[in-house]
UniProtKB/Swiss-Prot annotation:
Native species: Citrifermentans bemidjiense (strain ATCC BAA-1014 / DSM 16622 / JCM 12645 / Bem)
Highest taxon, organism lineage: Bacteria
Function: Required for maturation of 30S ribosomal subunits.
Protein name per the record: Ribosome maturation factor RimP
GO annotation terms (biological process): ribosomal small subunit assembly; translation
InterPro entries for this protein: Ribosome_maturation_RimP, RimP_C, RimP_C_sf, RimP_N, RimP_N_sf
Similarity-based family: Belongs to the RimP family.
SUPFAM superfamilies: YhbC-like, C-terminal domain (SSF74942), YhbC-like, N-terminal domain (SSF75420)
Keyword Cytoplasm appears in the UniProt entry: yes
Keywords: Cytoplasm, Ribosome biogenesis
Gene3D superfamilies: Ribosome maturation factor RimP, C-terminal domain (2.30.30.180), RimP-like superfamily, N-terminal (3.30.300.70)
The gene coding this protein: rimP
Length: 160
């Protein structure tokens, strides 16, 4: 099974296993580390937050299904955890949910903020998302608008 197919199937399984528990997939990594592949699953639970027991439940169920379906093309390690406090922002719904929070965005290419300063990293308060563009009030005082298709990586930042 191709890498894309593995990711799609694991995503489907997590949705099936997690939905009854109120658990959602935040991110999924399937990549080579050393000689083996790693399936790294990041989960969240909107009501009450994700805990160790939730992760263990999903891990056991996912592992059992992966063993039965046996579609993984090579040896792998399964890791299931919360996304942590610097949670990635992957979907439009993530940006909508975390309006007003401090975020860090890295782009594929240099982009200008409203003052004309070019950069690839934007840190500030998420002020909005519309028409595929996120608005950020930068920590330096400027504003920026970053198209989602230019975002290489985005995550929440811890506020002290």
């Amino acid at each position: 099974m191709a890498k894309v197919d593995v990711v799609e199937r694991v995503t489907e399984i997590i949705a099936e296993v997690g939905a009854p528990l109120g658990i959602e997939l935040v991110d999924l990594e399937y990549k080579r580390e050393g000689r083996d592949m790693v399936v790294r699953v990041f989960l969240e639970k909107r009501e009450g937050g994700i805990n160790l027991d939730d992760c263990a439940d999903v891990s056991r169920q996912l592992s059992d299904i992966l063993d039965v379906e046996d579609f993984m093309p090579e040896r792998y390690t399964l890791e299931v955890s919360s996304p942590g406090i610097c949670r990635p922002l992957k979907k439009v719904a993530d940006y909508e949910r975390f309006l007003g929070h401090l975020i860090k965005v890295k782009t594929f290419e240099m982009l200008a903020d409203e003052a004309g300063n070019k950069r690839k990293t934007f840190t500030g308060k998420l002020t909005g998302i519309a028409d595929g563009v996120i608005g950020i009030d930068l920590t330096e005082g400027q504003k920026a608008r970053v198209p989602l298709d230019k975002v290489a990586k985005a995550n929440l930042e811890f506020e002290f």
